[in-house]
A protein has these predicted regions:
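Interfacial loop-to-helix transition and helix-capping segments at the boundaries
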Residues: 298-302, 350-352
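Active-site rim elements
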Residues: 200-201, 255, 293-298, 341-344
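N-terminal periplasmic/intermembrane-space "pro-region" immediately following the signal or transit peptide
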Residues: 22-130, 138-142, 275, 501
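Bacterial N-terminal signal peptides that target proteins for export
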Residues: 1-12
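Bacterial N-terminal signal peptides
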Residues: 10-20
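Outer membrane beta-barrel
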Residues: 100, 107-288, 301-319, 323-331, ...
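Outer-membrane beta-barrel pore domains
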Residues: 146, 191-202, 329-501
């Protein structure tokens, strides 16, 4: 349509010029009348300008294709189109700000994504929600001998984040936040369960950064650089994370690993997609999430730094199946051995060496088994560290103060997937804690039975689980909804719905 309008415009200019010529000739003027040749020259100049405008307005091949499609859709048999439809199609074609074919979006492999056609830029947003109802029964909790029962709903996790790659598939990134579920006022109790005071705590519902890292693969090599806030390369259960395991991590993972073992640092990774992969580097310490650069004791930071490393050996199976603590969806039998180490140090000689040895089996038949030994050696014990999303704090005065201590623990889990939906599971744990308040029963045993139902894989999963601690536990483990119940039995019942988009 732009070409047609240019012709009309040119003809109009010529008509005006020719019509004005007699009038100009008749009017008295001191200027000499233009000759016929001069008029022809003016017409030629106007034609040149019109030709230039036509060239600038010429639609691109993509626009011509779009106009052609619009015409065919209007009358596919005759190829004719009404003037208004032609005007609309031409306007739509010329109003394109950019070629939409350069970006694609959709849903694949149970993930939403936005990416460039060449795959160099990818954004995958995600949301992870766990809605939980928990009942805790602490036997003979009160001095009168009565039980204490607590029940209620909680949004155990409400996490959002995104991951993908930038500039090249070799440069990947990951960032996510979780909402804090704590109250603004935290009640403090002693080993006997009596309230001794209150302290402030981050307000529930506020976002807390969990991970924010970048990873670069040196092209066509097995070497990677990994920097930012990430999982400490120590404990496999915590590296897997909350999306692909039981409703909550084991007590050893929560207490010894500080709930998902988030830290800040830089590591080097060797991964040639073969049977062995290694990650190791420097960190700010095992409990250094969301802290600044300052050392202890400035800013309440408990650790000055550390080094960490993990080695994994795959005997058989696919590595992707090792990223979950279940055999759900396994196409091949999986067997992997792993071991991790973390040495974290702080001012005043408070140093800590944590280590894990684990093995995971996941059969294509649905059978799953996992065993992990987690030990912790502490020099000049300051008290057992409390779990939390920001740095670390320590329990009240302990008989182990300034002593060198060692704490062993073992976690064993089995599960079996039935008909690709049902999955009964069981877990046994034993921990020996040090650095707890005076009078504590430090031998902790955890027996758990549960059942998963996969509506749509991990994306929509329902879980019911019952936990029994026959001798209780001398500290709170808020992450798993286990409350302090020193020397007395405790039952914990929970149901949970997981939504992962």
């Amino acid at each position: 349509m732009a070409v047609g309008w240019n012709r009309v415009f040119a003809a109009g200019l010529m008509s005006v010029g020719l019509a004005a010529s007699p009038a100009l000739a008749a009017a008295p003027s001191t200027q000499p009348s233009p000759t016929n040749q001069q008029l022809l020259d003016r017409i030629s100049a106007l034609e040149a300008e019109v030709h230039q405008l036509k060239t600038q307005q010429q639609p691109s091949p993509e626009q011509q294709s779009l106009v052609s499609q619009e015409r065919q859709s209007a009358n596919p048999e005759s190829g004719q189109v009404s003037p208004m439809a032609q005007i609309q199609a031409d306007a739509d074609a010329q109003s394109k700000f950019f070629d939409a074919g350069l970006v694609t979006a959709g849903y694949a492999n149970r993930r939403f994504f936005i990416q460039s056609d060449d795959g160099n830029f990818v954004l995958r947003p995600w949301v992870h929600i766990e809605i939980r109802n928990t009942t805790s029964v602490r036997q003979n909790f009160f001095t009168t001998g009565g039980n204490d029962t607590e029940n209620g709903f909680e949004l155990r996790r409400a996490r959002l984040g995104f991951d993908g790659n930038l500039f090249t598939p070799d440069f990947t990134y990951f960032i996510n936040w979780a909402t804090n579920r704590e109250n603004s006022t935290l009640t403090v109790v002693n080993s006997a369960g009596a309230t001794v005071g209150t302290t402030t705590s981050p307000v529930g519902g506020l976002p807390v950064l969990e991970e924010a890292w970048a990873k670069y693969n040196f092209h066509d090599t097995p070497w990677y650089i990994h920097v930012g806030q990430m999982h400490d390369p120590l404990d496999h259960e915590n590296i897997v994370g909350s999306k692909y395991r039981a409703p909550e991590a084991s007590l050893q993972g929560d207490i010894f690993g500080n709930t998902d073992t988030f830290t800040q640092g830089a590591t080097v990774i060797f991964d040639n997609k073969g049977p062995v992969r290694v990650e190791g580097g420097v960190t700010d310490g095992i409990r250094a999430a969301n802290t600044n650069f300052e050392d202890s004791p400035n800013g309440g930071i408990a650790y000055d730094g550390g080094v960490a490393a993990r080695v994994e050996w795959k005997v058989m199976g696919n590595w992707k199946d090792y990223d979950q603590l279940t055999a759900y969806g396994n196409k091949k039998d999986l067997l992997v051995f792993g071991t991790g180490y973390d040495y974290s140090y702080a001012g005043g000689g408070y140093n800590q060496l944590s280590h894990t040895i684990d093995v995971q089996y996941g059969g294509s038949c649905g059978l799953f088994a996992y065993v992990c030994y987690f030990g912790r050696y502490t020099e000049h014990n300051r008290g057992i560290p409390n779990t939390g999303g920001v740095s670390a704090s320590f329990a009240s005065s302990t008989p182990d103060l300034h002593k060198d201590t060692y704490e062993p623990s073992v976690d064993a889990e089995v599960a079996y997937v039935i008909n690709n939906h049902w999955e009964p599971f069981a877990r046994y744990e034993y921990l020996y804690l040090r650095g707890t308040p005076a009078g504590s029963q430090n031998n902790v045993t955890d027996l758990s039975l549960g059942l998963n139902y996969y509506f749509y894989g991990h994306n929509l999963k329902f879980t019911g689980m019952a936990t029994y601690l026959p001798t209780g536990i001398p500290i709170n483990d808020d992450s798993s909804d286990v409350l302090i119940s020193n020397r007395h039995g405790e039952f914990v019942f929970l149901t949970q719905l997981q939504l992962l988009l």
